[in-house]
């Protein structure tokens, strides 16, 4: 389980990609209220699934054993359901290969969305914009 406040190796990349998605929504969605643009930004495709291969392997292996993952937020559950679906398909096309290979391939493939809440996106985007204004881009 992820520890509160832990930061993944790819968090800065995810945040930059989310900000770019938001800026694209701003540029192309005339007449849409700002509060709705965060939701539009997170529903756009992402370059990968924003979860570590290790954590995804833990959850997918549990799902393959028949364990449920009902204790997760809806967006996170939807992400793991999509990863699971793709892992099952990948294994069907690549019999005999380990689950870890399937998870690695899937997690590093394009994702249909960011799997974040609108509120999370808003917090991330405003934080990045604040850092950009102050010149504090350490992330």
Name these PLM-found stretches.
Residues 1-28, 34-92, 136-139:
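Basic, amphipathic alpha-helix used for nucleic-acid engagement in HTH/winged-helix/SANT-Myb modules
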Residues 29, 94-95, 110:
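Short coil/turn residues that cap or connect secondary-structure elements
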Residues 42-61, 107-127:
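Short, basic interhelical loop/turn and adjoining N-cap
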Residues 100-104, 108:
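Sequence-specific DNA-binding recognition helix
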């Amino acid at each position: 389980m992820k520890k509160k406040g832990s930061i993944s190796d790819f968090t800065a990349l995810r945040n930059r990609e989310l900000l770019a998605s938001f800026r694209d929504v701003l540029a192309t969605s005339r007449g849409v209220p700002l509060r709705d643009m965060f939701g539009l930004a997170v529903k756009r495709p992402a370059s990968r699934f924003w979860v570590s291969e290790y954590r995804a392997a833990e959850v997918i292996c549990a799902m393959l054993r028949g364990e449920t993952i009902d204790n997760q937020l809806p967006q996170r559950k939807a992400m793991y359901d999509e990863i699971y679906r793709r892992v099952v398909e990948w294994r069907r096309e690549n019999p005999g290969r380990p689950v870890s290979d399937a998870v690695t391939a899937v997690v590093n493939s394009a994702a249909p969305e960011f799997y974040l809440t609108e509120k999370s996106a808003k917090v991330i985007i405003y934080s990045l914009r604040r850092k950009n204004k102050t010149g504090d881009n350490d992330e």
